[in-house]
Amino acid sequence: MRTHLSSLLLCVQLAGCATAGSVEAAQRKPLPRQTEPATIAVDLREAGRHLLHVKLVLPAQEGTMALVYPKWIPGEHAPTGPITDLASLQIRAGDTLLPWRRDNVDVYRFLVDVPRGVSSLNLTFDFISPPSGQPGFSSGASMTQGLAVLSWNQVLLVPEGAAPESFSLRPSLQLPANWKDATALEQESRAADLVSFKPVSLEKLIDSPVLAAEHLQVTQLGENHGAKVSIAVAAETEAELQISPAELKGMQNLVAEEAALFGARHFDHYQFLLTVSDGVAHFGLEHHQSSDDRLAGRALIDPELSLAGMGLLGHESVHSWNGKYRRPAGLATPDYQAPMKGDLLWVYEGLTEYLGEV
């Protein structure tokens, strides 16, 4: 992760000022057994209006059920889940619209009374992406007329207590016409602009953002101990996609140096997801098999901007080892609602910054 330190400190201070009180009780019982993956379908066709449409099918069982929106996001180290951008939530059992209520204390928690005999819930809602210029990670500006970065934590509600490593979902994505996409997720099928991915755990889904754009180009950078490494670049124009020979050589050297430094790899493949646009928030956010990297629109064609921005790629890819493969205990929480403890954040970020620059 790279951003302004003051923003991170502010988030930590706000987290410490949370109102005390007890969470409204939903009857605690074992989660409904998953006989098949939950499904999540995201429609990106109105990304130019900063609007996503979401459909979820979740397992359910009779009684009061709690659904939660991811709050503490890995790599952001703070309770920054963009709950304020969720809108128009409707929950149905079949064709029956069910009333729901917000928890009186925890605004990331929703309660719904599930009728007898109901085994699944159908949810629909919208995600309103912030306008250009809005800072933040998954709460920052992520869409323009020509491109979008989807962080799955933006568009998820899951049963409370769902284990990230075992709760399974089948994701799909409806793209605008003629757009391309890049992600660490494995594609199962594609029909025109509808992309279906193989089922994955909740943990892997949130750890696998999608870069989509009309102008998108993928370039192979080499291998790290047998695993292919590539970079996907999305931009507002074709001209801004172009990687110079010097930049390409630097990226290839980065892959080779990391292979030599760490001596092994823990991913099946790795892809830099690089957005070059003045319409999105600028930062880097690490993931296990990819990184969400965002730079100014001319970052690849302006030599000064290019030199300043290339260090971001080294920082975020090092995080795949230091921060993802191995994570400080206080940041390895059991789910996305449990608070993180940042007492070892200096190792997570400090060592990564050093190695990334080297």
Enumerate the predicted regions with their spans.
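Bacterial N-terminal signal peptides
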Residues: 6-16
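Residue-level detector of short, conserved catalytic/binding motifs and their immediate flanks
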Residues: 54, 87, 121, 169, ...
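Bacterial signal peptide processing site
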Residues: 18-20
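An active-site-proximal "capping" alpha-helix that borders the catalytic cofactor pocket
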Residues: 258, 347-357
